[in-house]
From Swiss-Prot:
The protein's assembly and partners: Forms oligomers.
Gene Ontology annotations for the cellular component aspect, listed alphabetically: cytoplasm; nucleoid
Limits of the SpoVT-AbrB domain: 5-52, 81-124
The UniProt record lists the keyword Transcription regulation: yes
Source organism of the structure: Alcanivorax borkumensis (strain ATCC 700651 / DSM 11573 / NCIMB 13689 / SK2)
Protein name stated in the entry: Transcriptional regulator MraZ
Amino acid sequence: MFTGSAALNLDAKGRLTMPTRYRASLIDTCGGQLVLTLHPFDDCLALYPRAEFMDTAKKLSEQRDSNPQVRQLKRRFLGQAAEIEMDGSGRLLVPPELRAAINLEKRAMLIGQLHRFEIWKEESWADVDGTLDPAALPESVQELSF
């Protein structure tokens, strides 16, 4: 389970170092085998343990290609996916095309989303964080007890 957030630095080789608190879980759940792709709706990257990505990809692949938006979603989510491996020091190489897609240069925010992570350019995260409009949430979410 991945929760919480962390500010990360991108090194000169385009690598991010996973916080220590997530490393053992990533080794246990996926042997450090991950998939990094463009988030389908937000200006960030989505980082999945490989099996979790495959489950999501299977569900998406079952959607009919007759809808042009479904085809575009598949292109973004599946077509931009890169299999990556966490090295022994907890580093992940972010492919140049994915860095360029979100203008990721030096600072990033890692945001836990339970079964996956989001990786945001630090400035983009600052723009998005705190913009929640509770009134715009579905009633089923508003009724949750926090």
